[in-house]
Amino acid sequence: MTLGKLIRALFLQRPPTRKLLPSWSLPKVLEALAKPPFEPLAEASLRDITIKTVFLVAIASGQRHSALHALSVAPGHIRWELGGVRLIPNPSYIAKNQTSSSSLVEIFIQPLSAHSSIGADKVWCPVRALKYYWHRTKDKRSGNQLFIITKEPFSPASRDTISKWIVAAIQAAGPEALAPGNVPRAHDTRSVATSWALFNGVSVEEIHKAAYWRSPNSFISFYLKDVPAAEPSFSRAALSAAAGTH
């Protein structure tokens, strides 16, 4: 038997399993991020502002932590537009499922206020958090990378550090936010965000485009989680629907 046939045989005997339930509750995490030490933003530490901003951007965009790591403040890479903010990563970044000939990655995030008349919902707005973070860090940053470590010398944050911040946001919700026997992972934001978006009216094709999957089947087969729908563009559905369950 060739090695390829042996691997295939083992795969068929023990196919990979996929958890249907998310390992943590997005509504509970959002609820935690709406309270001290994360709010009010004006009183929050740089670390807490960073944790909240990174998490909200991850959820609103459905991007991997590697894409967040590639976000840049170089001229033209953060565009504050009327309908939201457009983020363009470092040109050297290529999403996992892109090819070198693919068009440049652009991440567009809408403000939550554009889709909710409830003033209190602003605490979950990724555009608000990102703008506050950008102003708070612009005098500390020596390079062009958006996310920097929260202590001197304020050097560019690594991918691992960004992952740890995402996990810290999840852990801020306490053990009751975790499904039994689960450990929070930064990569889970991708599946949870896109699942909320799908269950709340965003087509698979839109999710495929926003999150840069090779095909919709990748999302359906490996990332779709069994999350409840709450109420009927990507960032709007992922955040506003989850926040609406409180």
Predicted regions and their residues:
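Extended, non-catalytic subsegments within catalytic or DNA/protein-binding/adaptor domains
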Residues: 1-246
